[in-house]
């Protein structure tokens, strides 16, 4: 950490991110923040707020908005604009980047895995000129009781659709790296074009998996939003001051195209 409490990246960590497409930050989030995030995740899931948020994305009217956003939960809002995280992102993509979206979930013990995919939103397909980053925050860490994250180093340099490897399920692939042991509060930063998969936990002892992911896009191109209520999301980020007065582009609308409903 530097004298402002920000994790200072070494040059080789920056180089590894660009070469491999991911960066592992064990125990990155302080226990105090994790302790406030977990009950907010419980509320988000148990009250039906998560389901209503998903339903709002399926609303035929782009103006439809959910009653509450993840970033309106106090600790989630802090996480979206968490200064040490944004400082690291600025080291990777430069000083101007914009918040894209946040997802929060508590997965049941023994939940199924998720097939190989990537989450890069830029189009057309051949455009990889700017970087999108997904920050995967594992509140309870990772171990065999919650499954593992498998990543395919270097695959972020491919020009491929999100589901180009989905037919493979979660099978082991040559060259993959499996991240399966991380302490509570750990974060994995992914170049969003990196192929990755969620491996289910093996049979036996299992526990719930708490994860919040937030994504950020390098400025310089127009990014497609994934939520029809994206303007409302950005406006709330500005109103709540989640940029901390330091990142003026973090919730700026001008970096997005219009929302297009998936076909």
Q: How should these model regions be labeled?
A:
Residues 1-19, 26-125:
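Non-heme Fe(II)-dependent double-stranded beta-helix
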Residues 126-144, 181, 215-219:
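Short, conserved beta-strand element in jelly-roll/cupin
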Residues 121-132, 175-176, 182, 207-208:
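A short beta-loop-beta micro-motif enriched in histidine and acidic residues
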Residues 2, 194-195, 199-263:
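Non-heme Fe(II)/2-oxoglutarate
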Residues 116-119, 164-173, 203-206, 227-232:
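Short, surface-exposed loop/helix-turn segments at secondary-structure junctions
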Residues 142-199, 221:
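Double-stranded beta-helix
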Residues 103, 118-120, 137-141, 151-153, ...:
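Short, structured patches in soluble enzyme cores that scaffold and shape functional sites
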């Amino acid at each position: 950490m530097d004298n402002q409490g920000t994790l200072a990246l070494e040059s080789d960590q920056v180089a590894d991110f660009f070469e491999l497409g991911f960066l592992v930050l064990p125990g990155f989030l302080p226990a105090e923040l994790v302790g406030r995030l977990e009950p907010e995740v419980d509320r988000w899931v148990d009250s039906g707020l998560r389901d209503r948020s998903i339903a709002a994305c399926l609303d035929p009217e782009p103006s439809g908005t959910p009653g509450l956003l993840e970033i309106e939960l106090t600790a989630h809002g802090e996480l979206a604009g968490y200064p040490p995280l944004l400082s690291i992102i600025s080291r990777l993509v430069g000083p101007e980047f914009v918040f894209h979206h946040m997802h929060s979930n508590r997965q049941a013990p023994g939940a199924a895995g998720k097939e190989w995919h990537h989450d890069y939103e830029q189009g057309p397909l051949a455009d990889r000129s700017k970087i999108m980053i997904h920050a995967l925050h594992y509140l309870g860490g990772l171990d065999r009781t919650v499954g593992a994250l498998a990543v395919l180093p270097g695959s972020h340099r491919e020009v491929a659709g999100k589901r180009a490897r989905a037919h493979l399920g979660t099978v082991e692939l040559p060259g993959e790296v499996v991240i399966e042991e991380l302490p509570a509060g750990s974060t994995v930063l992914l170049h969003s074009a990196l192929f990755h998969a969620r491996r289910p936990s093996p049979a036996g002892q299992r526990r719930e998996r708490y994860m919040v992911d937030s994504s950020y896009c390098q400025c310089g191109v127009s990014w497609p939003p994934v939520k029809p209520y994206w303007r409302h999301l950005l406006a709330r980020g500005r109103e709540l001051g989640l940029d901390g007065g330091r990142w003026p582009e973090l919730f700026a609308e001008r970096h997005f195209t219009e929302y297009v409903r998936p076909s």
